[in-house]
């Protein structure tokens, strides 16, 4: 799966994989127009890799602008050359891991991590403050839906593009009222989730 947040979203939209509505922006002025014209709460993401710290969940339009400005001002180097503004979706997060041989996959136990720095899900996101496995909210029905709607279409897309990927695929998901949605892909284990799975 691509390491760019923008390309991940584009792949999801193209293959009807459930994800959040998004906008890609390449300047602060472009971002401000979207931030001030939309009525839905937004999440701000650096487009490239940022060690799990490139996501901001602002509480206001002003915080949204400040987060976007900090990314464009070089907070994450070249990973912040483009910014993704994303619809803020609600629900608990869950991490699902698949080991892929290029064609087939096997699932590992699910996990839930806690990213916020402070208690009661407050403060900035971190690389991970703690985790547990398996994720109790991931019922058999949800897992079947995740396999059908997210995991298999993702693996099929890699195969269609002749991407012979061998390794772990980390599906960062949010369980919303309308079902599971992709919030991120990674080609690595999550940390600290991996510690609880092992």
Locate the predicted segments by residue.
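Single conserved hydrophobic/aromatic residue that forms the stacking wall/gate
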Residues: 1-9, 13
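Short gly/pro/ser/thr-enriched loop/turn and capping motifs at secondary-structure boundaries
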Residues: 6-7, 49-51, 115-117
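Short, glycine-/small-residue-rich phosphate/pyrophosphate-handling segment
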Residues: 10, 14-34
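Short glycine-enriched loop/turn motifs at secondary-structure junctions
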Residues: 16-18, 48-52
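Internal nucleotide-binding/catalytic subdomain
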Residues: 54-196
């Amino acid at each position: 799966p691509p390491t760019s947040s923008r390309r991940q979203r584009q792949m999801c939209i193209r293959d009807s994989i459930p994800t959040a509505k998004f906008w890609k922006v390449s300047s602060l002025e472009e971002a401000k127009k979207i931030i001030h014209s939309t009525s839905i709460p937004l999440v701000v993401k650096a487009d490239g890799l940022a060690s799990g710290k490139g996501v901001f969940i602002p509480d206001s339009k002003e915080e949204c602008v400040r987060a976007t400005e900090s990314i464009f001002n070089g907070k994450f180097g070249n990973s912040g050359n483009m910014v993704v503004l994303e619809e803020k979706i609600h629900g608990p997060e869950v991490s699902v891991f698949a080991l892929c041989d290029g064609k087939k996959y096997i699932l590992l136990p699910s996990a839930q991590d806690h990213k916020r720095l402070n208690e009661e899900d407050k403060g900035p996101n971190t690389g991970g403050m703690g985790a547990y496995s398996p994720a109790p909210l991931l019922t058999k029905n949800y897992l079947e839906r995740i396999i059908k709607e997210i995991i298999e279409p993702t693996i099929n897309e890699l195969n269609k593009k002749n991407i012979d990927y061998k390794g772990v695929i980390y599906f960062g998901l949010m369980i919303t009222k309308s079902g599971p949605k992709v919030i991120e892909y990674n080609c690595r284990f999550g940390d600290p989730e991996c510690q609880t799975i092992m």
